[in-house]
UniProtKB/Swiss-Prot annotation:
Catalytic activity, reaction form: Release of an N-terminal pyroglutamyl group from a polypeptide, the second amino acid generally not being Pro
Designated gene of the protein: pcp
Annotated compartments: Cytoplasm
Subunit architecture: Homotetramer.
Name of this chain's protein: Pyrrolidone-carboxylate peptidase
Enzyme Commission code: 3.4.19.3
Domain of life: Bacteria
CDD domains: Peptidase_C15 (cd00501)
GO biological process: proteolysis
Amino acid sequence: MAGVLLTGFEPFDGETVNPSWEVVKQLDGTMIAGQPVIARQLPCVFGEALSVLYAAIEDLQPRLVIAVGQAGGRVDISVERVAINVDDARIPDNKGQQPVDTPIVDGGPAAWFSTLPIKAIVSALRDRGIPASVSQTAGTFVCNHVMYGLLHKLQEQAGVRGGFIHIPWLPAQAAAHPGEPSMATATVREALETAIAVALRQSVDSKLGGGATH
C-alpha cells in the first residue's frame, strides 16, 4: 500500500472547466512527503463516479485518498467533516439523473466522518496565508455522493484514510458570476499539496476549534 489517490471532477452545470480537475491534474505524477500522487478524473454522474473511484482504489491500493470538488460561491478551501447517506439533487447530473431523497447505500449508516486530520489541515493552510475552514456539509449532490461512497468503501480497506475538500471557482469562472469569490489555481495547488503532506504525517487530528454556530 503506497501513494496518494487524488480525484477531481469533470465540468458540470454549464461550466466549461472544473477547478478541481484543473488543479488535481497538475499534481499527477508528483511526489509529496515521499509518496507518489496519482490523479483520476471522476464523472459528475451519480453511481458512475463511485464506479470509477472504486476501480482506481482497487487498482492503485493507495494509502490516502482525497477527493476534490468545485463549490462555486464558497470563499475558501473547505475541508469537509461529514458525508450523509442521501442523494437529493437540486440540478441534474451530467447524464440527466436527478435523484431525490435516495440513499447512497441502502441500509448504510446515516453518515460517515472524514478520516483526514481536517483541523490540522485547516490550521496549516491558514498558517500559509490560504483561506480555509472546516465545512459541516458537503451538500447532497455528486460531491457528497462521492465522499460518502469513498468513506463507506474505506471501511473494508484497512489503514487507508480519506476525505473530501471543496474549492472555490477559478477567477475565470467567477468573472461570469459577478460578485462571486474565486481562488487562483496556484493557491489551490499549494493548498492541496499542503493538505496531502499534513494528512500523510498526521493520523490523529489536532484538538482545535472548527465548529459552526449555524
